[in-house]
Regions:
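A short, basic N-terminal segment
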Residues: 1-41, 306-343
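Conserved NTP-binding/hydrolysis module of P-loop NTPases
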Residues: 11, 73, 83-102
Length: 343
């Protein structure tokens, strides 16, 4: 809707995992490098986790593009783990291009083993990637463990990559999955973007979509990062809504006011420390930035002086076990009283 207005060839902020728009920040480059190394070195079992919306699926699609571009690699990609064990093995065979006739689970396992041995003899790698792996039921996880046993005396026949939310780690830590856990050779947790990565991510998507100029102000990008916590999916949603509001308001530049309006509509709030970092960022900019920083310096000095003067009183007024055991404090310290002024 707004593409022509902003001089774009296509929507830059779709939430679909399009490898064309991939941005490889430091953490994403590290994750990709580990995945590629794990597959090429035939490590056998790899686990990658990340919070919802951090770009795991986009990265996996990019990995699949790279792997499928090699003649010596075959891949099977499972994006819906809600299958029975029987359907799971059948799905792997079909995705590997194996002609399957209806049979028993044993028939399927034998057919899979024969095809893996054939690939090994042809010096080919076979990779199974399971997305949303936190949704795997115990029976499927056990089956995956058994599949990881398919090997020769020198090499694993099947490279397995499990990708999921942090709940996957919690599942794998359960006592019943000890044997599976011991087979994991590589782990990686994909974090959210930092502020600079958020800026580069937005610029990268706009450039690929055909933008010839800057559309978001620095303040707008900072606000986007604060509101989204650096989560790529949320960045896409907020940027898309901001452009829509800007288009409706005939604004060719998206500033932080537009982003604020879009974020409020989407109920996106700043993080625990987001409000203060937002204030500090803006105090550091503009005509009176230097006076703002002087004020901060004086405030910090005041806090230090209070600690030096009342440190003994403050120390004796707390029962430190109360921080962990729920015991009540005796009095409010001077430092806390001072900080309450800013709350």
């Amino acid at each position: 809707m707004y593409e022509t207005f902003y001089g774009l060839k296509e929507n830059p902020f779709n939430v679909t995992p399009d490898p064309q728009f991939i941005y490889l920040g430091k953490s994403h480059r590290e994750a990709l490098a580990q995945l590629l190394y794990g597959v090429k070195a035939k490590k056998g079992f790899i686990v990658m986790t990340g919070e919802v919306g951090t770009g795991k699926t986009t990265l996996i699609h990019y990995l699949l593009e790279k792997l499928n571009g090699n003649d010596d690699t075959k891949t099977a990609f499972l994006f819906n783990p809600k299958l029975t064990v029987y359907d799971f093995i059948e799905y792997i065979l079909k995705d590997l291009g194996v002609v399957v006739q209806k049979g028993t689970k044993g028939d399927y396992l034998h057919l899979l083993h024969q095809n893996l041995l054939k690939a090994y003899q042809n010096d080919e790698k076979v990779v199974l990637i399971v997305d949303e792996a936190q949704g795997l039921n115990p029976a499927l996880l056990e089956e995956i463990r058994l599949l990881s046993n398919l090997e020769t005396s020198k090499s694993k026949l099947l490279q397995i990559v499990l990708v999921g939310q942090p709940e996957l780690n919690k599942t794998l830590e359960q006592p019943g999955f000890r044997q599976l856990r011991q087979r994991i050779n590589m782990r990686y947790h994909l974090p959210a973007f930092n502020g600079n990565e958020t800026k580069e991510y937005i610029a990268n998507r706009l450039r690929i979509a055909g933008a010839k100029r800057s559309i978001f102000t620095i303040g707008a990008i900072e606000e986007i990062h604060e509101r989204t916590g650096g989560i790529p999916r949320l960045i896409n949603i907020l940027c898309d809504n901001s452009l829509l509001i800007g288009y409706a308001s005939d604004k060719i530049i998206i500033d932080e006011k537009v982003v604020n309006e879009a974020a409020n509509d989407l109920k996106l709030r700043r993080g625990i420390f987001g409000t203060w970092s937002w204030i500090l960022l803006r105090m550091g900019r503009g005509l009176f930035g230097i006076w703002s920083w002087i004020f901060i310096g004086i405030s910090i000095t005041g806090v230090i002086l209070l600690i030096l003067q009342f440190g003994e009183t403050g120390y004796r007024s707390y029962n430190f076990t109360g921080w962990f055991g729920g015991l009540q404090r005796l009095v409010i310290t001077p430092l806390e009283r001072f900080l309450q002024f800013f709350r």
